[in-house]
Regions:
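Dynamic helix-loop-helix/coil hinge segments at AAA+ ATPase domain boundaries and subdomain interfaces
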Residues: 54-59, 70-89
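Canonical AAA+ ATPase core
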Residues: 124-162, 167-209, 214-312, 354-366
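Phosphate-binding P-loop
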Residues: 85-86, 94-100, 108-109, 210-213, ...
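Conserved C-terminal "switch" segment of AAA+ ATPases
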Residues: 54-66, 268-272, 278-341, 363-367, ...
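Hydrophobic positions on the alpha1 helix immediately C-terminal to the Walker A/P-loop
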Residues: 116, 120
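C-terminal engagement/docking regions of AAA+ P-loop ATPases
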Residues: 340, 360-512
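Conserved glycine(s) of the Walker
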Residues: 112-113
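Interdomain "pre-motor" coupling segment immediately N-terminal to P-loop NTPase/helicase cores
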Residues: 34-68
Length: 512
């Protein structure tokens, strides 16, 4: 490993009280810690220079605690990209970090467990010195591997250093049934033995993922899927903080904070976490889906990838995003779905993307320059929803009917929320003197705008529904079309209008 790093990386942060170093001027601080701009060239390259710089070695748990306290004290959000946990999960995680605990996150799929864990690297110091060439990030002040011990003993203060960025101090393993002790802890390297080394030589060891994350954070995802005999191999890591490899008479002390994630159903369906291992995790934190639809809308806006097409503007009105989120919340309440499996936020994200894609396809085909999702585009959600829910139904033919019922319930709920009830009667009465309105993929946005202009009550409802969407001016015809469809479909679901579906479109009429 090289003793120097590219100048684009920020300088190290000494730990001694009153001694600070910082990042280059083109790097914006992200951890809320006070920094002083110091040239990258001042970073020590030898053990002797490191001692003179006043750097102090601290355990990883203490490093997390210190930086978490600084983040809390500064008032910055601990995990700015994780939304909806500010009053529930994050306070528990902050307590666990301050207590120096290993943590297991328990929750259904799509609850940001892995994202939370990966975000913890932001609480590590930007740079960490190691003995150059070490496979397990040996501390220059207290090396533990045979290689690093011998090197420091031979070179003393002239021992060369390497610097590891915080992002490289995180290790992760997805637990699978074929995961072995060699993968996690280590094994004797037969190639090194073939080169002439003795089996008793510690240098023949090939370290696994856990020791290679020494002085860092290690996460095991889907922990119950790890076979029980392999889970036993982690007991020493969590309690005694050491590992033993094969028949070698070594106990390699490690400085690593362990994290794990698991789904609640895994305890009974696919596997279990052995009791001694659960007992060794200091904190167990239960995650959850967003409790507030507005928070889930923010998550969808943050995560969804909306298609970008030259010459086409894509606008997703707030009421359609609200319908997308309402579908997920309705699904989480449905007795026809397996709630133990959960309804992931990923479904909301995928539905938003599918809805926007359907609008883009329609706009490109019709030659329009603005693409806005409509209620009729919700048919595209069948594909994005199908793999993200588990339906508890003996009759597979009812799957489509159940999902359609969920979508209709979500639509009706949003309609009642965003369109005031006093506006409903005026639109219905106007339809008594109107032949009806046709909607669908083949109907251009201009036709909807003409319909709205010809029915004053509908124009009023559309204006109220769009609110700030029009930015104070006349809204685009595509936006009006989306609002018209929501109003008409809402009145139909409220049993105020009839809907006749034929081919690629539908027609709304007054109820007989």
């Amino acid at each position: 490993m090289s003793a120097t790093l590219p100048a684009a990386r920020p300088a190290y942060r000494p730990q001694a009280a009153g001694v600070t170093a910082g990042r280059p001027a083109d790097r914006v601080p992200t951890d809320g810690m006070p920094v002083t701009m110091v040239p990258v060239m001042t970073r020590p390259t030898t053990l002797g220079e490191l001692r003179l710089a006043g750097w102090e070695s601290v355990p990883v748990a203490e490093e997390l605690r210190r930086n978490a306290v600084a983040r809390i004290r500064s008032g910055e959000p601990m995990f700015p990209t994780v939304l909806g946990y500010e009053d529930t999960v994050i306070p528990q995680l902050e307590n666990a970090l301050l207590a120096g605990h290993d943590v297991i996150f328990l929750g259904e799929r799509g609850q940001a467990k892995t994202r939370l864990i990966r975000s913890l690297t932001g609480l590590l110091d930007e740079w960490m010195p190691i003995v150059a060439g070490s496979e397990i990030n040996d501390d220059p002040y207290g090396p533990v591997s045979r290689y690093a011990r011998d090197l420091v003993a031979e070179m003393g203060d002239d021992t060369e250093l390497g610097w590891v960025h915080r992002d490289d101090r995180y290790g992760e393993k997805l637990a699978t049934p074929d995961t072995s002790i060699a993968d996690l802890i280590g094994e004797v390297d037969p190639i090194r033995v073939a080169e002439g080394r003795y089996l008793s030589d510690e240098l023949t060891l090939h370290y696994g993922l856990v020791p290679r994350t020494n002085r860092g954070l290690f996460c095991i995802n889907e922990l119950p899927d790890l076979s029980e005999r392999i889970q036993v191999g982690l007991l020493n890591v969590l309690e005694e903080r050491d590992i033993q490899i094969r028949g070698h008479r070594i106990r390699l002390p490690l400085d690593v904070v362990m994290f794990a994630s698991a789904n609640p159903e895994d305890y009974t369906n696919r596997g279990r976490i052995i009791t001694p291992l659960k007992d060794r995790f200091g904190s167990q934190i239960r995650t959850h889906y967003p409790l507030d639809p507005d928070v889930e809308m923010d998550i969808v806006e943050q995560e969804a990838t909306i298609p970008v097409v030259d010459g086409l503007s894509v606008v997703v009105p707030e009421f359609m995003s609200r319908v997308v989120v309402a579908i997920s919340h309705e699904a989480r309440r449905s007795p026809h779905l397996n709630q133990r499996s959960g309804v992931s936020v990923r479904m909301s994200i995928a539905n938003q993307e599918a809805l926007a894609a359907s609008a883009v396809r329609r706009a490109v085909r019709s030659g329009e320059t603005v693409a806005v999702p409509r209620v009729s585009d919700l048919d595209a959600l069948a594909a994005s929803m199908a793999g993200k829910v588990e339906i508890d139904s003996i009759d597979d033919d009812r799957d489509g009917e159940i999902l359609d019922r969920i979508v209709r319930a979500a639509l009706l709920g949003v309609f009642r929320e965003v369109v005031p009830g006093e506006l409903h009667r005026g639109v219905v009465e106007a339809f008594e003197e109107h032949d009806g309105v046709s909607v669908g993929e083949a109907v251009g946005s201009g036709a909807y705008a003409e319909v709205a202009a010809g029915i004053p009550a509908l124009t009023t409802a559309v204006t109220v529904l769009l609110g700030d969407e029009s930015d104070g001016g006349d809204p685009p015809a595509a936006l009006v079309a989306s609002a018209v469809e929501l109003v008409l479909e809402g009145l139909h679901l409220s049993k105020r209008l009839n809907k006749e579906t034929t081919g690629r479109g539908s027609r709304y009429r007054i109820r007989a």
